[in-house]
């Protein structure tokens, strides 16, 4: 017994006193051990985000079981139907997660369930579901796309604003899914509620091209007959407004119906960018850079038709209102065009007709007041009307930001909103300098405070952007686009070891590698004799999938090392984030990669 105990003590001492090389021999190479441990701690994407679906009649149920220590990005979930139309749905609120590079984002942990109504589905209809997530330990998976076949669902009625789906057409439902490249579902309503449409119409009535015309229009409505009672005056004014509203409503329905036929095309990023440019041009006209209106010959003819109607009669007043809806002044052309373009892009007939009706109703309310009470309740004309017109220019500028947010993502969307808000508050502050009342000083302080607050995203972008640029300016990667190009570069490496960094914009840890690891002087000196390659797989296309599959890459960041013969040194592979000290030690423990 004593002999066994002494033998055990001697064996333990020999292990503790063994040199470093002996330890490596006992446990295997240190880099290899670390790599195996790193590989084993990350699970395949199907296990990290177990996805399931089932259809119950006209409802599609989607569910994700999220493994502990992993999370899904809310903004990276998109639903795109093929030969089907989906009803309105919204993603549940996620958990706020602060990201150094993307700011405040929302994520899902543990479980996510979506219930999506199907308004119609043709034969061989399907829905593609795309999602993307990461591990908390610093590892991100490429976006996953699953195609779900749908059972046939017959639309309840075509009058509800949803067109029938034929067997060859691809219809993206309005206000339910993203265009290609977008990150989050499109809201189920227009960005402006019906109340906003009404308020915009009222505001347009106080522009310099509209308000001075109301007394004249009021006189035309009443005609030259004997004085009317207040009740009769109210009826005539309301009938005129309803005639004008009818024209706008029909215009909204026609444009929305046309947009519905081209819904898929109107969701394309290039189309969204084109619409955004048009909105910017329309907004510039509100700032007085140029004037938009119907040709003068057409306006003259419409005015003659309107004047030929007999004032004071219900039919004549209604006809005058309908024709007035077609006569656009320079102050109303740009807002009306912006609303029509957005309605066409949304493709929602109910929202299109309703929005234009409320817009016309808003423009008509001041006219009813003028007709009933004269000019007593209407403010005097002055420079303030031009300021109202310019303010609506900023309202129109909000529409391109809303559309570009779908193409550029939430991060750039936040920066654009910040830029627009800075411009608006700056404009308002400059206008306030023209006033000298005491209370205006308080408004100026509030405007300055608001200006500083809304400028924060731009400040973060500027300073972080400069920091990142300075951090990575000394690292020099040679880009490779696909597997054949990589193989060609490896064949021409001239006996040098090669490091391949697999990078993507959606990989947060990849950006951390750039900022904190590759920027380190010691790391750069260690890699001085290594050929540095980088493959940007952000698009996650077929070529990228082939490259990742070739090397059995689960996700990013992943860094591969190749010897002088072009063979991967599997023991040196890095999976997941390493800071500069850890990565430097990894390189030093694997001399073959930096010799």
From Swiss-Prot:
Q: Which family does it belong to?
A: Belongs to the thioredoxin family. DsbD subfamily.
User: Which residues fall in a coiled-coil region?
Assistant: none
Q: Where is this region: Disordered?
A: 166-186
Q: Which GO terms describe its cellular component?
A: plasma membrane
> Which keywords does this Swiss-Prot/TrEMBL entry list?
Cell inner membrane, Cell membrane, Cytochrome c-type biogenesis, Disulfide bond, Electron transport, Membrane, NAD, Oxidoreductase, Redox-active center, Signal, Transmembrane, Transmembrane helix, Transport
Gene3D superfamilies per record: Glutaredoxin, Thiol:disulfide interchange protein DsbD, N-terminal domain
Q: From the record, give the transmembrane residue ranges.
A: 200-222, 234-256, 271-293, 314-336, 356-378, 391-408, 412-431, 438-455
Does the entry feature the keyword Cell division, yes or no? no
InterPro entries assigned to the protein according to its UniProt record, in alphabetical order: Cyt_c_assmbl_TM_dom, DsbD_gamma, DsbDN, DsbDN_sf, Thiol_diS_interchange_DbsD, Thioredoxin-like_fold, Thioredoxin-like_sf, Thioredoxin_CS
Q: What does this protein do?
A: Required to facilitate the formation of correct disulfide bonds in some periplasmic proteins and for the assembly of the periplasmic c-type cytochromes. Acts by transferring electrons from cytoplasmic thioredoxin to the periplasm. This transfer involves a cascade of disulfide bond formation and reduction steps.
Q: Name one GO biological process term.
A: cytochrome complex assembly
**EC number from the UniProt entry:** 1.8.1.8
State the protein's name.
Thiol:disulfide interchange protein DsbD
**Compartment list:** Cell inner membrane
Has the keyword Ribonucleoprotein been applied to this entry? no
Annotated gene? dsbD
């Amino acid at each position: 017994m004593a002999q066994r105990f002494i033998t055990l003590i001697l064996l333990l001492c020999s292990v503790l006193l063994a040199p470093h090389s002996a330890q490596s021999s006992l446990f295997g190479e240190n880099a290899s051990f670390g790599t195996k441990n790193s590989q084993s701690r990350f699970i395949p994407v199907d296990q990290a985000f177990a996805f399931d679906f089932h259809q119950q009649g006209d409802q599609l149920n989607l569910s994700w079981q999220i493994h502990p220590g992993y999370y899904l990005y809310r903004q990276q979930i998109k639903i795109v139907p093929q030969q089907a139309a989906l009803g309105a749905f919204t993603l549940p609120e996620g958990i706020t997660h602060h990201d150094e590079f993307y700011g405040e984002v929302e994520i899902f942990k543990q479980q996510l369930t979506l219930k999506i109504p199907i308004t119609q589905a043709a034969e061989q209809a399907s829905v593609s579901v795309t999602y993307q997530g990461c591990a908390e330990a610093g590892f991100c998976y490429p976006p996953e796309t699953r195609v779900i076949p749908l059972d046939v669902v017959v639309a309840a009625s075509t009058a509800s604003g949803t067109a029938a789906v034929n067997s060859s057409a691809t219809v993206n439902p309005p206000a339910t899914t993203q265009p290609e490249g977008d990150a989050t579902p499109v809201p189920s309503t227009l960005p402006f509620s019906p109340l906003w449409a009404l308020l915009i119409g009222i505001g347009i009535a106080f522009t310099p091209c509209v308000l001075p015309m109301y007394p004249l229009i009021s006189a035309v409505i009443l005609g030259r007959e004997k004085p009317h009672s207040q009740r009769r005056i109210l009826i005539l004014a309301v009938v005129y407004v309803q005639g004008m509203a009818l024209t706008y409503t029909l215009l909204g329905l026609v444009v929305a119906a046309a947009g519905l036929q081209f819904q898929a095309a109107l969701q394309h990023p290039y189309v969204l960018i084109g619409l955004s440019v048009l909105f910017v041009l329309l907004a510039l006209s509100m700032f007085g850079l140029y004037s938009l209106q119907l040709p003068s010959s057409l306006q003259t003819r419409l005015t003659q038709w309107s004047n030929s109607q007999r004032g004071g009669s219900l039919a004549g007043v209604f006809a005058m209102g309908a024709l007035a809806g077609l006569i656009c002044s320079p102050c109303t052309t740009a807002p009306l065009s912006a609303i029509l373009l957005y309605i066409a892009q949304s493709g929602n007939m109910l929202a299109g007709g309703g929005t234009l009706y409320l817009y016309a109703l808003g423009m008509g309310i001041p006219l009813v007041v003028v007709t009933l009470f004269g000019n007593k309740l209407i403010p005097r004309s002055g420079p303030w009307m031009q300021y109202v017109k310019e303010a609506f220019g900023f309202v129109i500028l909000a529409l391109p930001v809303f559309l570009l947010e779908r193409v550029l993502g939430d991060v750039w969307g936040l920066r654009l909103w910040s830029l627009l808000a800075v411009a608006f508050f700056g404009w308002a502050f400059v206008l306030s300098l023209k006033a000298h009342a005491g209370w205006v000083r308080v408004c100026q302080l509030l405007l300055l405070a608001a200006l500083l607050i809304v400028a924060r995203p731009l400040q973060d972008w500027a300073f972080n952007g400069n920091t990142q640029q300075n951090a990575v300016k000394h690292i020099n990667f040679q880009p490779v686009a696909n597997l054949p190009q990589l193989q060609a570069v490896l064949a021409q490496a001239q006996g040098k070891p090669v490091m391949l960094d697999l990078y993507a914009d959606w990989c947060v840890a990849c950006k951390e590698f750039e900022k904190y690891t590759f920027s380190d002087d010691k790391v750069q000196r260690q890699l001085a004799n290594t050929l540095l390659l980088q493959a940007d797989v952000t698009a996650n296309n077929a070529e990228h999938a082939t490259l990742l599959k070739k090397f059995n890459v689960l996700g990013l960041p992943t860094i591969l090392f190749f010897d002088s013969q072009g063979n991967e040194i599997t023991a040196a592979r890095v999976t997941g984030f390493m800071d500069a000290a850890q990565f430097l030690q990894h390189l030093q423990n694997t001399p073959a990669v930096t010799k």
